[in-house]
């Protein structure tokens, strides 16, 4: 409720009405990333899509909630950034809209404010990830590699053991992080499960 009150009061700061038109909310996109894998479809729902008529620009906004604002680590997480970058790329392909005229941004809504704080806190943080050619190619490679590794061209799932992508971040809430025997990072356990 507090978030909505804050947003109603400050909406003009985040959304300018002049020349902007709302294209859609929760706008679905469906596309086949690799033509030879016609049964493997990328599906996404774009939270907010807006059009700026004077500059012929589309803006895709992805709303995220967070306990606090995003730190440097979260902003640099290429997996998180890839979602919006792929939305930009596939929107361009699907609607034949110039990719250089598509902007993307994360609209991060902060759930918690610090008590007894000496400075004014904002409930909303805007983060615009880099989305040039290099970022697009990186994100496409992730998706294409995943499709080729996990699916046959007819769309059938390739049954096999897949190596876990374990990072220090995933250990944070793991129930076995202090259990040497059951820890997924334990090399002996990985060898036993044949996923190392």
Residue ranges with predicted function:
Residues 47, 80-82, 124-130:
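Short, low-complexity, polar/charged sequence segments that are solvent-exposed and flexible
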